[in-house]
Amino acid sequence: MKAIQGYHLIRPEDLHWRPSNLMRIPNADYLERTGSENIGARLWRLPPKSANTLHKHIRSEEFYFVLEGTGRMRVGDETLTIPKYGGVLVGPEQLRQVFNDTDDEVLWLIVGAPEELEFLQGSKSKMDLSLIYPVDPKQLPNELAGIEWPTKS
């Protein structure tokens, strides 16, 4: 992995918001245009009564930081409540899932390193997705029982 040279300024208008593949959560990748191979950073805007994937990483640590609202998160067998401007560092191999069981949007900044290059566009190898999704990634936490997410459009 090579380090970038100099710096990259990222303005809010540079961000491209799109729904995530599995759970349709709006997100914007801060570093996709920088070419960084060492770190990843995304904004995730969780709508009310929604959840992101239940997953883990092979070698990446992730720092979850709540920018707006009150964050809720499953880490292993625990459910955490993270206040605005609070954060959680999660190591690799630890199953995790951010979710929103409130009636308001929650905005997260999630930063991970090292970047897992096998997921980058143009990767030469096929990734074994069972390594990051050892269980059904779309399963919702008990706090969202009876909720359908992602919603059918």
Predicted regions and their residues:
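A short, N-terminal "cap"/entry segment at the start of jelly-roll beta-barrel domains
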Residues: 1-39, 53, 123-153
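Short beta-strand His + acidic residue motifs that chelate non-heme Fe in jelly-roll/DSBH
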Residues: 54, 73-74, 90, 96-102, ...
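Short acidic-glycine-tyrosine-enriched beta hairpin
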Residues: 77-93
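A short hydrophobic beta-strand segment most commonly corresponding to one strand
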Residues: 89-90, 103-122
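A generic structural signal for short beta-strands and their flanking turns/coil linkers
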Residues: 37-42, 52, 60-62, 69, ...
